[in-house]
Protein backbone atom coordinates (compact mmCIF):
# COMPACT_ATOMS: atom_id res chain seq x y z
CA UNK A 1 0.00 0.00 0.00
CA UNK A 2 1.02 3.61 -0.54
CA UNK A 3 1.90 4.51 3.05
CA UNK A 4 1.69 8.28 3.27
CA UNK A 5 2.50 8.80 -0.38
CA UNK A 6 0.86 9.22 -3.78
CA UNK A 7 1.81 7.44 -7.00
CA UNK A 8 2.00 9.57 -10.17
CA UNK A 9 2.54 7.93 -13.56
CA UNK A 10 4.22 5.97 -15.01
CA UNK A 11 4.86 7.33 -18.48
CA UNK A 12 6.44 5.25 -21.25
CA UNK A 13 6.02 1.80 -22.74
CA UNK A 14 4.72 -1.57 -21.55
CA UNK A 15 7.94 -3.55 -22.07
CA UNK A 16 10.32 -4.81 -19.41
CA UNK A 17 9.44 -5.76 -15.83
CA UNK A 18 7.63 -3.73 -13.16
CA UNK A 19 9.91 -2.21 -10.52
CA UNK A 20 9.63 0.27 -7.66
CA UNK A 21 11.92 2.02 -5.20
CA UNK A 22 10.84 3.96 -2.12
CA UNK A 23 13.56 5.80 -0.23
CA UNK A 24 13.74 5.47 3.55
CA UNK A 25 15.34 8.91 3.69
CA UNK A 26 15.65 11.78 1.21
CA UNK A 27 16.92 10.88 -2.28
CA UNK A 28 20.43 12.33 -2.57
CA UNK A 29 21.79 10.78 -5.76
CA UNK A 30 20.43 9.67 -9.13
CA UNK A 31 22.66 7.69 -11.47
CA UNK A 32 21.59 7.32 -15.10
CA UNK A 33 23.19 5.78 -18.17
CA UNK A 34 22.12 7.67 -21.26
CA UNK A 35 22.81 8.24 -24.92
CA UNK A 36 19.92 8.47 -27.41
CA UNK A 37 17.59 7.18 -24.71
CA UNK A 38 17.72 6.46 -20.98
CA UNK A 39 19.46 3.10 -20.68
CA UNK A 40 19.14 2.62 -16.91
CA UNK A 41 18.54 4.42 -13.64
CA UNK A 42 19.44 3.88 -9.98
CA UNK A 43 19.09 5.87 -6.77
CA UNK A 44 20.74 6.48 -3.41
CA UNK A 45 19.16 8.02 -0.31
CA UNK A 46 20.58 10.03 2.60
CA UNK A 47 21.17 6.89 4.67
CA UNK A 48 23.37 5.47 1.89
CA UNK A 49 20.80 2.88 0.76
CA UNK A 50 20.99 2.14 -2.96
CA UNK A 51 18.09 0.94 -5.06
CA UNK A 52 19.64 -1.48 -7.51
CA UNK A 53 19.71 -0.73 -11.24
CA UNK A 54 16.52 -0.60 -13.31
CA UNK A 55 16.98 -1.21 -17.05
CA UNK A 56 20.42 -1.54 -18.64
CA UNK A 57 20.11 -5.21 -19.61
CA UNK A 58 21.13 -4.79 -23.27
CA UNK A 59 24.40 -6.78 -23.36
CA UNK A 60 25.88 -4.83 -26.29
CA UNK A 61 28.73 -2.54 -25.25
CA UNK A 62 27.58 0.29 -27.53
CA UNK A 63 24.19 0.29 -25.75
CA UNK A 64 25.56 0.91 -22.24
CA UNK A 65 25.39 4.70 -22.58
CA UNK A 66 27.31 7.39 -20.73
CA UNK A 67 27.10 7.64 -16.95
CA UNK A 68 25.56 10.81 -15.51
CA UNK A 69 25.35 11.43 -11.77
CA UNK A 70 22.98 13.96 -10.18
CA UNK A 71 23.82 14.93 -6.61
CA UNK A 72 21.04 16.52 -4.53
CA UNK A 73 22.23 18.55 -1.54
CA UNK A 74 19.67 17.49 1.02
CA UNK A 75 18.34 18.94 3.36
CA UNK A 76 18.60 22.39 1.73
CA UNK A 77 17.71 20.83 -1.64
CA UNK A 78 15.13 18.14 -2.34
CA UNK A 79 13.64 16.48 -5.42
CA UNK A 80 10.09 17.65 -6.17
CA UNK A 81 9.22 16.44 -9.70
CA UNK A 82 10.40 15.03 -13.02
CA UNK A 83 9.74 15.68 -16.70
CA UNK A 84 10.84 14.01 -19.90
CA UNK A 85 9.78 12.27 -23.07
CA UNK A 86 9.15 8.76 -24.33
CA UNK A 87 9.16 7.32 -27.84
CA UNK A 88 10.51 4.65 -30.15
CA UNK A 89 14.09 3.39 -29.81
CA UNK A 90 15.23 0.21 -31.60
CA UNK A 91 11.57 -0.72 -32.05
CA UNK A 92 10.74 -0.33 -28.35
CA UNK A 93 8.63 2.36 -26.64
CA UNK A 94 10.99 3.65 -23.94
CA UNK A 95 11.98 6.76 -21.98
CA UNK A 96 13.98 8.96 -24.38
CA UNK A 97 14.82 11.91 -22.09
CA UNK A 98 14.58 12.95 -18.44
CA UNK A 99 14.92 16.07 -16.30
CA UNK A 100 14.93 16.14 -12.49
CA UNK A 101 13.41 19.17 -10.77
CA UNK A 102 14.36 20.22 -7.24
CA UNK A 103 13.27 23.17 -5.12
CA UNK A 104 16.42 24.98 -6.32
CA UNK A 105 17.07 24.01 -9.94
CA UNK A 106 16.44 21.61 -12.84
CA UNK A 107 19.01 18.95 -13.78
CA UNK A 108 18.92 17.94 -17.44
CA UNK A 109 17.57 17.34 -19.94
CA UNK A 110 19.42 14.02 -20.34
CA UNK A 111 18.89 11.93 -23.49
CA UNK A 112 17.31 12.83 -26.81
CA UNK A 113 14.34 15.21 -26.81
CA UNK A 114 13.65 14.85 -30.55
CA UNK A 115 10.40 13.08 -31.39
CA UNK A 116 8.13 11.18 -29.03
CA UNK A 117 5.66 12.36 -26.42
CA UNK A 118 6.68 14.75 -23.66
CA UNK A 119 5.40 14.55 -20.09
CA UNK A 120 5.56 16.79 -17.04
CA UNK A 121 3.70 17.13 -13.74
CA UNK A 122 2.11 20.48 -12.82
CA UNK A 123 2.77 19.89 -9.14
CA UNK A 124 3.67 22.01 -6.11
CA UNK A 125 4.37 21.42 -2.41
CA UNK A 126 5.69 17.91 -3.06
CA UNK A 127 8.76 15.83 -2.27
CA UNK A 128 9.66 12.85 -4.47
CA UNK A 129 10.19 9.90 -2.10
CA UNK A 130 10.53 7.14 -4.66
CA UNK A 131 10.20 5.97 -8.23
CA UNK A 132 8.41 3.19 -10.10
CA UNK A 133 8.23 2.00 -13.67
CA UNK A 134 9.30 -0.74 -16.04
CA UNK A 135 12.79 -1.78 -17.07
CA UNK A 136 14.49 -4.33 -19.31
CA UNK A 137 17.07 -3.60 -21.98
CA UNK A 138 16.37 0.08 -21.32
CA UNK A 139 14.24 2.23 -19.01
CA UNK A 140 10.80 1.47 -20.47
CA UNK A 141 8.64 3.61 -18.17
CA UNK A 142 9.00 5.92 -15.18
CA UNK A 143 6.74 7.42 -12.51
CA UNK A 144 7.21 8.93 -9.06
CA UNK A 145 5.98 8.52 -5.50
CA UNK A 146 5.41 11.90 -3.82
CA UNK A 147 4.59 13.16 -0.33
CA UNK A 148 3.40 16.60 0.77
CA UNK A 149 6.00 19.04 2.11
CA UNK A 150 6.33 19.63 4.95
CA UNK A 151 2.95 18.18 5.97
CA UNK A 152 -0.46 18.58 4.43
CA UNK A 153 -1.50 18.71 0.79
CA UNK A 154 -0.01 18.71 -2.70
CA UNK A 155 -1.27 21.08 -5.39
CA UNK A 156 -1.87 19.90 -8.97
CA UNK A 157 -2.66 22.41 -11.71
CA UNK A 158 -4.39 24.70 -12.39
CA UNK A 159 -5.38 23.95 -15.97
CA UNK A 160 -7.23 26.44 -18.16
CA UNK A 161 -6.87 30.05 -19.20
CA UNK A 162 -5.13 32.95 -17.44
CA UNK A 163 -8.22 35.17 -17.03
CA UNK A 164 -10.92 35.22 -14.37
CA UNK A 165 -11.68 37.99 -11.92
CA UNK A 166 -12.29 35.76 -8.93
CA UNK A 167 -9.59 33.42 -7.67
CA UNK A 168 -10.78 30.57 -5.45
CA UNK A 169 -8.86 28.33 -3.13
CA UNK A 170 -10.25 26.00 -0.46
CA UNK A 171 -9.48 22.80 1.42
CA UNK A 172 -12.02 20.72 3.33
CA UNK A 173 -11.65 19.08 6.72
CA UNK A 174 -13.87 16.11 5.85
CA UNK A 175 -14.47 15.04 2.23
CA UNK A 176 -15.87 16.47 -1.00
CA UNK A 177 -19.49 15.30 -0.83
CA UNK A 178 -21.36 17.17 -3.59
CA UNK A 179 -20.15 18.80 -6.81
CA UNK A 180 -22.64 21.02 -8.64
CA UNK A 181 -21.69 21.68 -12.26
CA UNK A 182 -23.43 24.06 -14.64
CA UNK A 183 -22.35 23.23 -18.19
CA UNK A 184 -23.29 23.73 -21.80
CA UNK A 185 -20.59 24.14 -24.46
CA UNK A 186 -18.14 24.63 -21.59
CA UNK A 187 -18.10 24.55 -17.78
CA UNK A 188 -20.11 27.63 -16.90
CA UNK A 189 -19.68 27.31 -13.12
CA UNK A 190 -18.90 24.89 -10.33
CA UNK A 191 -19.73 24.65 -6.61
CA UNK A 192 -18.96 22.17 -3.84
CA UNK A 193 -20.26 20.93 -0.50
CA UNK A 194 -18.19 18.97 2.02
CA UNK A 195 -19.18 16.18 4.41
CA UNK A 196 -19.80 18.69 7.20
CA UNK A 197 -22.32 20.64 5.11
CA UNK A 198 -20.04 23.60 4.30
CA UNK A 199 -20.58 25.10 0.83
CA UNK A 200 -17.88 26.52 -1.49
CA UNK A 201 -18.77 28.61 -4.55
CA UNK A 202 -20.24 28.95 -7.00
CA UNK A 203 -17.14 29.77 -9.07
CA UNK A 204 -17.83 31.28 -12.50
CA UNK A 205 -21.36 31.64 -13.87
CA UNK A 206 -21.42 35.43 -14.27
CA UNK A 207 -22.81 35.44 -17.82
CA UNK A 208 -26.58 35.87 -17.16
CA UNK A 209 -27.39 34.75 -20.70
CA UNK A 210 -25.43 31.49 -20.52
CA UNK A 211 -25.71 29.79 -17.13
CA UNK A 212 -25.75 26.21 -18.45
CA UNK A 213 -27.60 23.11 -17.29
CA UNK A 214 -27.21 21.89 -13.71
CA UNK A 215 -25.68 18.46 -13.00
CA UNK A 216 -24.77 17.07 -9.60
CA UNK A 217 -22.18 14.51 -8.48
CA UNK A 218 -22.83 12.96 -5.06
CA UNK A 219 -20.02 11.11 -3.27
CA UNK A 220 -20.78 8.88 -0.28
CA UNK A 221 -17.56 9.47 1.68
CA UNK A 222 -17.59 6.06 3.34
CA UNK A 223 -17.42 3.80 0.30
CA UNK A 224 -16.43 6.38 -2.31
CA UNK A 225 -14.01 9.31 -2.31
CA UNK A 226 -12.69 11.74 -4.92
CA UNK A 227 -9.17 10.87 -6.13
CA UNK A 228 -8.55 13.05 -9.21
CA UNK A 229 -10.00 15.08 -12.09
CA UNK A 230 -9.55 15.22 -15.85
CA UNK A 231 -10.91 17.45 -18.58
CA UNK A 232 -10.22 19.85 -21.42
CA UNK A 233 -9.72 23.58 -21.81
CA UNK A 234 -9.89 25.80 -24.88
CA UNK A 235 -11.73 28.62 -26.63
CA UNK A 236 -15.37 29.31 -25.78
CA UNK A 237 -16.95 32.56 -26.96
CA UNK A 238 -13.53 34.17 -27.21
CA UNK A 239 -12.38 33.10 -23.72
CA UNK A 240 -9.88 30.37 -22.84
CA UNK A 241 -11.81 28.39 -20.25
CA UNK A 242 -12.39 24.88 -18.92
CA UNK A 243 -14.57 23.22 -21.56
CA UNK A 244 -15.17 19.82 -19.93
CA UNK A 245 -14.60 18.08 -16.61
CA UNK A 246 -14.68 14.55 -15.22
CA UNK A 247 -14.42 13.61 -11.55
CA UNK A 248 -12.59 10.38 -10.74
CA UNK A 249 -13.24 8.42 -7.55
CA UNK A 250 -11.96 5.12 -6.20
CA UNK A 251 -15.17 3.58 -7.59
CA UNK A 252 -15.93 5.22 -10.95
CA UNK A 253 -15.59 8.26 -13.20
CA UNK A 254 -18.37 10.87 -13.12
CA UNK A 255 -18.67 12.74 -16.41
CA UNK A 256 -17.55 14.16 -18.69
CA UNK A 257 -19.59 17.32 -18.15
CA UNK A 258 -19.46 20.09 -20.75
CA UNK A 259 -18.14 19.63 -24.29
CA UNK A 260 -14.66 18.14 -24.72
CA UNK A 261 -12.65 20.51 -26.92
CA UNK A 262 -9.19 22.02 -26.91
CA UNK A 263 -6.30 20.72 -24.81
CA UNK A 264 -6.90 17.70 -22.60
CA UNK A 265 -5.45 17.21 -19.11
CA UNK A 266 -5.37 14.33 -16.65
CA UNK A 267 -3.23 13.10 -13.77
CA UNK A 268 -2.21 9.42 -13.63
CA UNK A 269 -2.38 9.33 -9.84
CA UNK A 270 -2.96 6.65 -7.18
CA UNK A 271 -3.24 6.59 -3.41
CA UNK A 272 -4.73 10.07 -3.35
CA UNK A 273 -7.63 11.89 -1.74
CA UNK A 274 -8.81 15.23 -3.17
CA UNK A 275 -9.19 17.64 -0.25
CA UNK A 276 -9.81 20.92 -2.09
CA UNK A 277 -9.82 22.94 -5.30
CA UNK A 278 -8.23 26.12 -6.63
CA UNK A 279 -8.55 28.17 -9.80
CA UNK A 280 -10.26 31.22 -11.26
CA UNK A 281 -13.80 32.05 -12.34
CA UNK A 282 -15.58 34.90 -14.11
CA UNK A 283 -18.19 34.58 -16.83
CA UNK A 284 -17.23 30.89 -16.91
CA UNK A 285 -14.83 28.55 -15.10
CA UNK A 286 -11.51 29.88 -16.37
CA UNK A 287 -9.19 27.40 -14.66
CA UNK A 288 -9.19 24.64 -12.06
CA UNK A 289 -6.69 22.63 -10.01
CA UNK A 290 -6.85 20.28 -7.04
CA UNK A 291 -5.30 19.77 -3.62
CA UNK A 292 -4.61 16.15 -2.73
CA UNK A 293 -3.21 14.31 0.24
CA UNK A 294 -2.14 10.69 0.64
CA UNK A 295 -5.07 8.43 1.45
CA UNK A 296 -3.00 6.33 3.84
CA UNK A 297 -0.57 8.18 6.10
CA UNK A 298 0.66 5.13 7.99
CA UNK A 299 4.41 4.57 8.17
CA UNK A 300 6.65 1.64 9.05
CA UNK A 301 9.27 0.62 11.62
CA UNK A 302 12.71 -0.69 10.68
CA UNK A 303 14.06 -3.78 12.52
CA UNK A 304 17.63 -4.96 12.02
CA UNK A 305 19.69 -5.49 9.95
CA UNK A 306 21.60 -8.58 11.00
CA UNK A 307 24.79 -9.75 9.29
CA UNK A 308 28.05 -8.28 8.07
CA UNK A 309 29.15 -4.78 7.12
CA UNK A 310 30.31 -5.57 3.58
CA UNK A 311 28.55 -4.74 0.33
CA UNK A 312 26.33 -1.73 -0.29
CA UNK A 313 23.16 -0.76 1.62
CA UNK A 314 19.81 -1.54 -0.05
CA UNK A 315 16.12 -1.30 0.78
CA UNK A 316 12.82 -2.46 -0.70
CA UNK A 317 9.28 -1.52 0.32
CA UNK A 318 6.35 -3.32 -1.33
CA UNK A 319 3.46 -1.42 -2.91
CA UNK A 320 1.02 -4.13 -1.83
CA UNK A 321 1.34 -7.58 -0.23
CA UNK A 322 4.64 -9.40 -0.82
CA UNK A 323 3.66 -12.60 -2.63
CA UNK A 324 6.96 -13.99 -3.91
CA UNK A 325 10.54 -14.20 -2.63
CA UNK A 326 13.33 -15.52 -4.88
CA UNK A 327 16.34 -16.83 -2.95
CA UNK A 328 19.59 -18.03 -4.47
CA UNK A 329 21.41 -20.10 -1.85
CA UNK A 330 24.23 -22.58 -1.29
CA UNK A 331 26.36 -22.60 1.84
CA UNK A 332 25.14 -19.05 2.35
CA UNK A 333 22.48 -16.75 0.87
CA UNK A 334 23.76 -15.50 -2.48
CA UNK A 335 20.93 -13.10 -3.37
CA UNK A 336 17.32 -12.11 -2.73
CA UNK A 337 14.57 -10.57 -4.87
CA UNK A 338 10.90 -9.83 -4.20
CA UNK A 339 7.60 -9.45 -6.02
CA UNK A 340 4.34 -7.95 -4.73
CA UNK A 341 0.69 -8.36 -5.72
CA UNK A 342 0.74 -5.22 -7.88
CA UNK A 343 3.23 -7.04 -10.13
CA UNK A 344 6.24 -4.92 -9.16
CA UNK A 345 9.61 -6.70 -9.10
CA UNK A 346 12.39 -5.51 -6.84
CA UNK A 347 15.98 -5.37 -7.98
CA UNK A 348 18.15 -8.40 -7.10
CA UNK A 349 20.12 -7.77 -3.92
CA UNK A 350 23.45 -9.62 -3.87
CA UNK A 351 24.51 -12.21 -6.44
CA UNK A 352 27.30 -10.09 -7.92
CA UNK A 353 29.84 -12.95 -7.97
CA UNK A 354 29.12 -14.75 -11.29
CA UNK A 355 31.14 -17.80 -10.21
CA UNK A 356 29.08 -18.46 -7.08
CA UNK A 357 25.38 -17.88 -7.77
CA UNK A 358 23.81 -20.80 -5.87
CA UNK A 359 20.54 -22.66 -6.42
CA UNK A 360 17.23 -20.91 -7.03
CA UNK A 361 14.43 -21.24 -4.46
CA UNK A 362 11.03 -19.54 -4.70
CA UNK A 363 8.67 -18.83 -1.81
CA UNK A 364 5.09 -18.12 -2.93
CA UNK A 365 2.78 -16.39 -0.43
CA UNK A 366 -0.98 -16.62 -0.98
CA UNK A 367 -1.79 -12.98 -0.14
CA UNK A 368 -4.15 -11.64 1.27
CA UNK A 369 -5.18 -14.74 3.25
CA UNK A 370 -1.48 -15.37 3.90
CA UNK A 371 1.01 -12.62 4.67
CA UNK A 372 4.62 -12.35 5.78
CA UNK A 373 5.06 -11.65 9.51
CA UNK A 374 8.76 -12.19 10.29
CA UNK A 375 12.14 -13.67 9.35
CA UNK A 376 14.83 -15.66 11.15
CA UNK A 377 18.23 -17.00 10.18
CA UNK A 378 21.95 -17.09 10.81
CA UNK A 379 24.96 -15.05 9.79
CA UNK A 380 28.64 -15.92 9.89
CA UNK A 381 31.80 -16.39 7.89
CA UNK A 382 31.68 -17.65 4.32
CA UNK A 383 34.83 -18.26 2.29
CA UNK A 384 35.17 -17.94 -1.48
CA UNK A 385 38.81 -16.92 -2.08
CA UNK A 386 38.25 -14.17 0.53
CA UNK A 387 36.34 -14.52 3.80
CA UNK A 388 33.02 -12.65 4.06
CA UNK A 389 30.53 -12.21 6.91
CA UNK A 390 27.23 -12.94 5.19
CA UNK A 391 23.74 -14.23 5.84
CA UNK A 392 24.27 -17.99 5.92
CA UNK A 393 20.63 -19.09 6.23
CA UNK A 394 17.14 -17.59 6.13
CA UNK A 395 13.58 -18.61 6.99
CA UNK A 396 10.44 -16.64 6.18
CA UNK A 397 7.47 -16.81 8.56
CA UNK A 398 3.88 -16.05 7.56
CA UNK A 399 0.66 -16.15 9.58
CA UNK A 400 0.22 -19.73 8.29
CA UNK A 401 3.64 -21.35 7.85
CA UNK A 402 7.44 -21.06 7.94
CA UNK A 403 9.38 -21.44 4.67
CA UNK A 404 12.97 -22.62 4.94
CA UNK A 405 15.60 -22.59 6.16
CA UNK A 406 17.39 -21.80 2.92
CA UNK A 407 21.20 -21.90 2.87
CA UNK A 408 23.25 -23.62 5.58
CA UNK A 409 22.71 -22.63 9.22
CA UNK A 410 26.06 -21.59 10.72
CA UNK A 411 27.36 -18.77 12.90
CA UNK A 412 25.12 -16.49 14.94
CA UNK A 413 21.36 -17.00 14.87
CA UNK A 414 18.78 -14.21 14.85
CA UNK A 415 14.99 -14.00 15.01
CA UNK A 416 12.33 -11.36 15.66
CA UNK A 417 9.91 -12.13 18.55
CA UNK A 418 7.11 -10.16 16.97
CA UNK A 419 3.30 -10.38 16.92
CA UNK A 420 0.29 -9.02 15.04
CA UNK A 421 2.14 -7.39 12.19
CA UNK A 422 2.80 -7.49 8.47
CA UNK A 423 6.24 -7.20 6.87
CA UNK A 424 6.11 -4.28 4.42
CA UNK A 425 9.64 -4.56 3.06
CA UNK A 426 13.29 -5.42 3.59
CA UNK A 427 16.63 -3.66 3.94
CA UNK A 428 20.24 -4.65 4.41
CA UNK A 429 23.61 -4.81 2.66
CA UNK A 430 24.62 -6.78 -0.42
CA UNK A 431 27.43 -7.28 -2.91
CA UNK A 432 28.81 -10.63 -4.02
CA UNK A 433 26.38 -12.16 -1.51
CA UNK A 434 23.61 -11.09 0.86
CA UNK A 435 25.70 -9.46 3.59
CA UNK A 436 22.91 -8.30 5.92
CA UNK A 437 19.12 -8.24 6.15
CA UNK A 438 16.41 -6.46 8.17
CA UNK A 439 12.67 -5.85 7.80
CA UNK A 440 10.15 -3.00 7.73
CA UNK A 441 6.94 -3.68 9.67
CA UNK A 442 3.74 -1.78 10.37
CA UNK A 443 3.98 0.61 13.35
CA UNK A 444 1.37 -1.13 15.53
CA UNK A 445 3.79 -4.02 15.98
CA UNK A 446 4.61 -5.32 19.47
CA UNK A 447 8.24 -6.45 19.74
Swiss-Prot record:
CDD domains recorded for this chain? Answer: Jacalin
State the superkingdom: Eukaryota
Keyword list (alphabetical) reads: Antimicrobial, Lectin, Repeat
Molecular function as annotated in GO:
D-glucose binding; D-mannose binding
Tell me which residues make up the Jacalin-type lectin domain. Answer: 5-148, 153-294, 300-443
Q: Which PANTHER family match?
A: JACALIN-RELATED LECTIN 3, JACALIN-TYPE LECTIN DOMAIN-CONTAINING PROTEIN
Specify the protein name.
Mannose/glucose-specific lectin
Q: Which organism is it from?
A: Parkia pendula (Inga pendula)
Amino acid sequence: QLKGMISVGPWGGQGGDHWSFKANHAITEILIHVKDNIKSISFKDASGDISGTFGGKDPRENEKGDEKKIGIHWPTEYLKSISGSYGDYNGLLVIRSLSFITNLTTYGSFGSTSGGESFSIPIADSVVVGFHGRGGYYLDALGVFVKPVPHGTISFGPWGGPAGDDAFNFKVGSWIKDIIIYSNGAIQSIAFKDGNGHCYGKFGGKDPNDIGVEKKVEIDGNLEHLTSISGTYGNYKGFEVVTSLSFITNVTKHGPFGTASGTSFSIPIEGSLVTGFHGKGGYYLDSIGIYVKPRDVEGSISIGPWGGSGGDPWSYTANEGINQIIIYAGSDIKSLAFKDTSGFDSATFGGVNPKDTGEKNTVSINWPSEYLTSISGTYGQYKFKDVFTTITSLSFTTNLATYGPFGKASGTSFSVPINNNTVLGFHGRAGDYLDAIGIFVKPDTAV
